[in-house]
Curated annotation (Swiss-Prot):
Keyword Methyltransferase: no
Pfam short name (any one): HSCB_C
Family, per entry: Belongs to the HscB family.
Protein name: Co-chaperone protein HscB homolog
GO terms for MF: ATPase activator activity; protein-folding chaperone binding
PANTHER family: IRON-SULFUR CLUSTER CO-CHAPERONE PROTEIN HSCB
GO biological processes: [2Fe-2S] cluster assembly; protein complex oligomerization; protein folding
Domain J: 3-75
Name of the coding gene: hscB
Keywords: Chaperone
Length: 166
């Protein structure tokens, strides 16, 4: 299941060298680009397209910290995105409501300053969450990591909504 890590010759871990990931991605993408197989057999062309797709999927997954964490959890048999794992701690639910209210008010009032401040606050929360994920994986505390992945998905979605409003 750690196919993506193997493909990029990276040790399966949450904390990875993203510069190495980027360099390896560029090398793999160039090596298996379908255009390089234009004069090859139909089978080889199909293989190149499939490999290119796998490389792109792996890169997107490993580049995004939350997707990388979810992928790591799956390698340990835990699906953080499964419907039965959608609950949040009450404190986080209350914080979600506050952030949503701030977003709605700022959007309605076209208050760019409030939107930027909210975006900065959420970015800071994401950084704290990434530190927490690093610690959870180091302790092999996968239940906590799964909860953090779900929180991270919410934060990603909220930041996307803020970006759309800006």
């Amino acid at each position: 299941m750690s196919q993506y890590f193997t493909l990029f010759r990276i040790e399966p871990a949450f904390d990875i060298d993203t510069e190495n990931l980027e360099q390896t991605y560029r090398a793999l993408a160039a090596r298996f680009h379908p255009d390089k197989f234009a004069s090859a057999s139909a089978f080889e062309q199909k293989q190149a397209v499939m490999m290119s797709s796998t490389i792109n999927d792996a890169y997107r997954t490993l580049k995004n910290p939350i997707d990388r964490a979810a992928y790591l959890l799956k390698t340990s048999g835990i699906d953080a995105d499964a419907p039965e794992h959608t609950s949040f701690a009450s404190e986080f639910l209350m914080q979600q409501m506050e952030w949503r209210e701030t977003l709605m008010e700022a959007r309605a009032g076209k208050d760019l300053e409030s939107l930027k401040n909210l975006d900065n606050e959420i970015r800071d929360e994401q950084e704290k969450l990434f530190c927490g994920l690093k610690q959870s994986f180091a302790r092999q505390d996968y239940d906590t990591a799964a909860q953090q992945v779900r929180q991270g998905r919410f934060l990603d979605k909220l930041r996307n909504e803020i970006s759309s409003a800006l």
